[in-house]
Each structure stands twice: as structure tokens, then as C-alpha cells.
Amino acid sequence: MMTLTWNYPNELASPNLFIKSAEKGSTLKNDEGFNLFDSSKGLTEKGFFFIQRMEELGMIIDVSHLSDAGFWDIVQHTKKPFVASHSNARALCGHCRNLTDDMIRAVAGRGGVIGLNFYGCFLNETNDSHSRVARMAAHARHMLKVGGSGCLGLGSDFDGISGELEIQDCSQMQKLVEGLERAHFTGTEIENILWRNVMRVYREML
């Protein structure tokens, strides 16, 4: 599995780029405190070559960190399942790293999976780094409603997140299970999120 970019443009693709104020040099923000961004730059010519070779070699394409334009380049120029390894629902949290409902449907429609991200700034309605299990459950419910029972897995991003974390590390994952149960997820839905959906994609692709 490989993502085509991180937080900066490279020779393959671009992320959503924060828009800077011409006067102050700072990043412009919306009313919820999220950075405004330019989503228009997608894959480069080399990026299009890479995704073709990745599919030929059986590699899984990861669209987390890609710009919106890059996401739709993947949709239009590939045929196999792809993943968003650590992204949430933009409808519930306006951060540019999250997926719109149309994106969630596109991942699900291709048979891919989205990894639920535990970072507070990707979970909350405002730019707040406090990571709460209740917000994880809310994003999970929304993504299942939009994309169906097969679209969601786990993408905690423990190695890259900070802030006040209700789940500190993988030894505390039972807190997520209990939170999903409190939010009335079924046992089958929870099993799908914990491992079945991701394993399905791996077995199909690898």
C-alpha cells in the first residue's frame, strides 16, 4: 500500500494546499477555525504512470493526504479498490483531510475502505484537538450511512497525532468497542469496522 503524497506537493501529486493571506502571510480560516484550502492540483504526469503500475503490480492506492482533485483523478483513472487509510467525514468536521460524502460513496462503490482517524482536529466540529470516542462513533455512523457497512475500518494514526486523546494507544481499543456499543452499533458492524472490512480488501488485492 502506498500514498502518493504527504502534507506537501511532490513529483507524483499534491495535497489540499492551505491558502495564505497576501497581507499577513498567515493561513486563512473559516468560521469554524479550519484552514481554507486550494483543492485544484491533482496528480502529475508521473503520478498517473505510478497509479497504472501500482494496479499492475497489485499495490493498494491510498488516497489519504491527496487533494480533492487528486482523489478524483484516482477514481477516474483506476479500476481496483483503493483506500483512504486515515480520514474521516468532512460533513461532520470540515478539515481538508476528511472526505466529502461523494468521496465516501466513491471509495465504497469501488469496494475500498476508509480508516477511521482518531485525531481530534479531524473529528470535531471546530478545530479542537481533544479526541473523544463519542465523536469517533458519530463519524463511523455517518460513514456507514453514506457508504454502507463495508466501507469502514480503523486508521488511528497513533504515530502522527497529538492532543488530549481518550484512546492513548492500541492497548485501549476496548474503549472504542464500548463507545460503538453505546452508540447502538451491532456486533456485526463493530466486527466489520475492527477487522473484517480491511481484511476483505487485503485478501482481494494482495
Predicted segments — roles?
Residues 5-9, 59, 64-69, 87-90, ...:
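Active-site beta-loop-alpha junctions enriched in small/polar residues
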Residues 12-14, 92-99:
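Short, charged, surface-exposed secondary-structure boundary motifs
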Residues 108, 113-123, 127:
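A conserved active-site cap/scaffold subdomain adjacent to cofactor or substrate pockets
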